[in-house]
């Protein structure tokens, strides 16, 4: 009997030791902020230009941006701040007041159309798409849609 009780006590002590070591390991591996991704907006502005940075900031302003985004816009590179020295940030209202160069107009318009079209299709549901006939639509075996008529 003493052999079985000693083996059970050693297994319980080893499980306690394992549990304590796991807790210490978890405490040492706490999450730390990634310093490389801290100013991602300035990196995007550097890669894709001022148009994308302006669209990102305007989308944040439309969604009710926080003070953190305002702080990020203050840390923008000097080339972006030079575009609008009075405010230090880019915005659609400022862009509409100041005419962009003719070469940037088509690109800016395409980006603006893409961003607004995404909002237009946001609320469509399955019920809204099925209202095409009195009795609905039918998918045939060959993959074509046919109305069931009135």
Swiss-Prot record:
GO terms for MF: hormone activity
Proregion span(s): 32-127
SMART domains recorded: NAT_PEP
Tissue specificity of this protein: Expressed in brain, but not in atrium or ventricle.
Subcellular location: Secreted
UniProt keyword annotation of Disulfide bond present: yes
Primary subcellular site in the record, as a coarse category: secreted
InterPro entries: Natr_peptide, Natr_peptide_CS
Keywords from the named record: Cleavage on pair of basic residues, Disulfide bond, Hormone, Secreted, Signal, Vasoactive
Region: Disordered, residue numbers: 60-109
Record carries keyword Plastid: no
GO biological process entries: blood vessel diameter maintenance; cGMP biosynthetic process; receptor guanylyl cyclase signaling pathway
Annotated Gene Ontology cellular component terms: extracellular region
Disulphide bond pairs: 134-150
Signal sequence interval, chain numbering: 1-31
Biased composition range(s): Low complexity: 60-73
Protein role: Hormone which plays a role in endochondral ossification through regulation of cartilaginous growth plate chondrocytes proliferation and differentiation. May also be vasoactive and natriuretic.
Family annotation (PANTHER family): C-TYPE NATRIURETIC PEPTIDE
Family: Belongs to the natriuretic peptide family.
Descriptive protein name: C-type natriuretic peptide
Name of the gene this protein is made from: cnp
